Amino acid sequence: MIKEAENSIVIVTTEEGLKRKADVLAKYLRKAKERGVAIKISAPIKKETDEIKELRKVAEIKDLGLSARFCIVDNESVMFMLAHDADIHPSYDIGIWLNTKFFASALGQLFNLNWNTIKVKN
């Protein structure tokens, strides 16, 4: 999904998820940024780690107070996880990937309402 992004990437994750994604996705997010893709990440941030500092070079990062795990690409594709990562072993984690512009666009609009209007916590 992220490798194919043309316009936008939205990632909503947990604090631990952000740490894991920093290593795995950094290269792809950097390449997406170079292509002009707008990248927004929402995650609870208790401490500004080196991983978060690196991600801030390619993405806007805010703590919106959301408890969710999903990714929206170009308001056309959505990947969402069914459980909080603290509640499930990684090898049993389940995600659903949908290519539906209608749902992805609606979810993206809701996310952007929060992004643009809710007071940022960090």
Language-model segments: what does each one mean?
Residues M1-S8:
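Secondary-structure "cap/kink" motif recognition
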Residues E4, E15-N122:
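PLD/PLD-like phosphodiesterase catalytic module centered on the HKD motif
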Residues I11-T13:
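Short beta-strands and strand-loop turn motifs
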